[in-house]
Each structure stands twice: as C-alpha cells, then as structure tokens.
Amino acid sequence: MKNLFTKRNISLLVSMLVILFFYLLPDMTWGLSHEALWAIGIFFASLIMWINVSIDWPSLISLFMIGLLPSYGFNKMLQGSFGNSTVAFLLFTFILVYPLSQTNFVRRITIAFITNKVARKGPWHFVCFLFGAITFIGLFISPSVLFVAFLPFLEDIYKVLDIKKGSKTGNMLMMGTAFCISLSSGMTPIGHVWPTLAMSYFAGSEIGYPISAFEYMAFGIPTGIVLLVSLILIFKFIYRPDDIKSIDTAKAINLRGSIAKADVREKAIIAILVLVVFLWISPSLVKNAMPEYYALINGMTTAMPPLLGCILMFVISFDGKPLLNFKEATTKGVMWGSILMTAAATLVGATL
C-alpha cells in the first residue's frame, strides 16, 4: 500500500482531479466556455505533472487530453504538436550539434580561452575566461550534452592546476560550470528548449509577432553577459574562496599539448554549423536591403537550416565514415523528453 502513495502517484491523481474539476464546471463560469475551462484544467494539470513527475511521458497525457477537446480532435492535436516547425527545429538542432560534442571542439575552445596571456595574469582572470569559454560553447550545444562533455575536462584542469576537489575554489569552479551551462541555454535557441518554446509561444499569442533567431540572440546574449558578470562578482565578493591565490595559472599552458590539431572531420562539422547559423541570422541582417531573400528564407521556417545541416552531415563522409551517424545521434544526441514536452507545451499554449 505504501507504494501507492508515492509523490508520483499522488501528483498524477491530483492532475486528473484538476482536469475533472474544470471539466465539471458549468458553461460560462468566469465568462468562459466549457471547452475553455477544460483547456485551463489541462494546463494546470500539465504543470503539476511536469514539476512533480517528469517532462517526458506525462506530456503524452497532456496531448491525449487535448485530443479529446471537441474543437481539436486527435488529428489536429498531432498536427499542432509533432507536426509544428518548433518541434522539428528542436529535433534537427539536437541531431545537428551532437557530432560537435564528439570532437575536441569543447576542449579546444576552452584551452584557447584559458591559456591566453590575459587569462594567465592571475586566478580571477583565469576564472573569468574559463566561465566565458563555457558560456560561449553553451550557445551552440544543449546543456545536458555539454555538461557530460565538459566534466572530464574540468577534472583535467583540476589536476594540471593542483586544485583539490571539495576545496572552496574547486566547488566554485564546479558551481560556476553548472551555472554558466544553464545560463547559456537561455541565450540562444540553438539546441535549447526554453528559448524555442518562448519564441513559439510569442509567435502564436494574440500579438502574433514572430521572433527570429537573430532577434532573440540580440537580446539574449547581452542579457546573458550581464548575468555572467554578476555571477563572477558574487563569487569574488560574497563567496570569496580563500584558497584561490594558490592557483598557478602559468601551468594552464600545459593543457595546450593535451589535444591534437583539428582534423578535416571537425573542420567540416564546424563549417556546416557556421552555414546553419548564417542561414538563421542573415535574413534579419539584410531584411531591408534584400527583402526577397528575407521572405524566401523566413518562409522556410527556422527548421530548414538545421535540416539542411543534418542532410549535409549524413551525406559527407571521410574514410567511409559519415560526419553524422543517424542511429547514434538519435539515441544519444536527442533529448526526447524535451521534444515531448515542447510538443505538449506548444500545443497547450496554442489551445489557451
């Protein structure tokens, strides 16, 4: 019996009761139709399940409930969830950036940041460039993939600079890594769920103003930089690690020999990613000068560039091995829980 009263089961029960409560309310309660009340119930139930149960399979419950709405039905529900460009954009972007995490790109960029002359001037200079590197890389890679890829390298940094795990400086670098990865996931929509959801919801709202990837980044990146500076100031003046002066930043130069030069595969992957980003941001840059180009690319939705990038990576191969392995990318690179939640959240928002 104890297994019945778990947080999971109680949350599911409460969610169903919330839907039932709004379903049983009389028509025109609070001036809303019966179907609108039902939709509100589904919205609150979805929030309860996402917060207390999970973001993946409970999203299917939300989709199923919306499919029961008379004005939707299951055909329209499927078109509005898995058939919308937001979900396709996120899916293709997850697949596209996966090969990047399998290269030495993360280590290469980080080493370039933390071994320059300015970064080696002192411990806090080093910290600023390390957090800056993590934030920069996070602009293009999903947070979960980046954290898994970066953690082993952080261990190497500890060893080279003689930073002890559990020390105040060690804890600061670990916390800062997690914070910077989370922060960067809100600065661009590239492989990131929440910016993609926000852009989709705003485009489908009563205002109905579609936000391009460039417009989002023009606001998100400066805001993220301000928050990054604030984070470093909090660490320096409030957290104040007393052992940070023991870091010998000159040793960071030893990290340069830990990776080989970029091979042709890595260069090809980066070139394709640059092309995709160009197709995302270039229409907004030449909107007035080249309106036909703007209309053409924008009319293909934001899902077109990553789809093109995926196709190129599947086609291009070196030594008989394609840049992108479909099975590996879809099993290890795609955050399916995020895909399901995006599909459900997009549809719930449109329903409301």
Show the residue positions of the predicted features.
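Hydrophobic transmembrane alpha-helices of multi-pass small-molecule transporters
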Residues: 1-89, 215-351
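Alpha-helix capping and helix-loop boundary segments enriched in small/acidic/polar residues
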Residues: 32-36, 83, 87, 100, ...
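Helix-loop interface residues and adjacent transmembrane-helix termini in multi-pass membrane transporters
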Residues: 51-54, 102, 210
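Membrane-embedded alpha-helical segments and adjacent helix-loop junctions characteristic
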Residues: 58-164, 332, 337-352
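Peri-membrane helix termini and adjoining interfacial loops of integral membrane proteins
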Residues: 64, 104-109, 196-204, 244-250
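Membrane-interface alpha-helices at helix entry/exit sites of multi-pass transporters
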Residues: 119-129, 159-175, 208-219
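Alpha-helical transmembrane segments and, especially, the helix-loop junctions at the ends
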Residues: 134-152, 168-210, 223, 227-237
